[in-house]
């Protein structure tokens, strides 16, 4: 991600603990070393800096989104599994599971009634995503696949990516 932004002419800063410096990151990249899981330390480390674009890929997303209000022109967050009804709580629906394909506007677990058997982890992800969009209405949120790439055990996304890369634009769905 860092090198892709550099290739496109961005001036890049990365915020991380500094515990695992990568030789793949060029020297021109500013490193902001702090604990991204501690909002007070992160706020102090950011100071009054502003950014045209902030890509949040780890740390406490809800807190980081709040810290970046007024500091980031555009927020892109990456993380979490789907927070839609039926994901993580398949037996709460009939037929069981999340509908496939699922629209981006489908019901979230946080929109279910109090008696709905919600998976708490999935509910927390949904609460976080809702907070991101409330704080940054033009934000984009990208969810990680299970594992990305041709070596994953359950090739759920890769089979579709491979078709796109091969120029096969049609996909038969049930």
Please provide the spans of the model-predicted regions:
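Conserved beta-strand scaffold positions in the cores of enzyme catalytic domains, especially
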Residues: 31, 75, 139-141
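N-terminal Rossmann/SDR dinucleotide-binding element
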Residues: 1-56, 67
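Residues at the starts of beta-strands that form the adenosine-phosphate
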Residues: 11-13, 73-74, 138
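NAD(P)-dependent short-chain dehydrogenase/reductase
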Residues: 135-174
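NAD(P)-cofactor binding segment of oxidoreductase domains
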Residues: 47-108, 125-131
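Active-site Tyr-X1-5-Lys
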Residues: 105-141, 145, 156
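Short aromatic-enriched loop/helix-cap "lid" or pocket-rim segments at secondary-structure transitions
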Residues: 25-27, 87-91, 152-155
């Amino acid at each position: 991600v860092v090198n892709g932004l550099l290739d496109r002419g961005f001036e890049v800063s990365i915020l991380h603990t500094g515990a695992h410096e990568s030789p793949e990151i060029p020297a021109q990249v500013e490193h902001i070393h702090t604990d991204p899981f501690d909002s007070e330390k992160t706020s102090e480390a950011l100071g009054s800096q502003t950014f045209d674009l902030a890509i949040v890929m780890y740390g406490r997303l809800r807190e980081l989104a709040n810290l970046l209000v007024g500091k980031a022109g555009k927020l892109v967050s990456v993380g979490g599994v789907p927070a839609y009804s039926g994901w993580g709580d398949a037996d709460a629906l009939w037929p069981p599971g999340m509908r496939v394909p699922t629209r981006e506007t489908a019901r979230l677990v946080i929109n279910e009634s109090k008696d709905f058997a919600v998976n708490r982890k999935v509910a927390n992800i949904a609460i976080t995503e809702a907070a991101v969009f409330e704080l940054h209405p033009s934000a984009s949120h990208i969810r990680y696949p299970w594992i990305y790439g041709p070596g994953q055990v359950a090739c759920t996304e890769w089979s579709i990516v491979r078709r796109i890369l091969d120029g096969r634009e049609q996909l038969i769905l049930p």
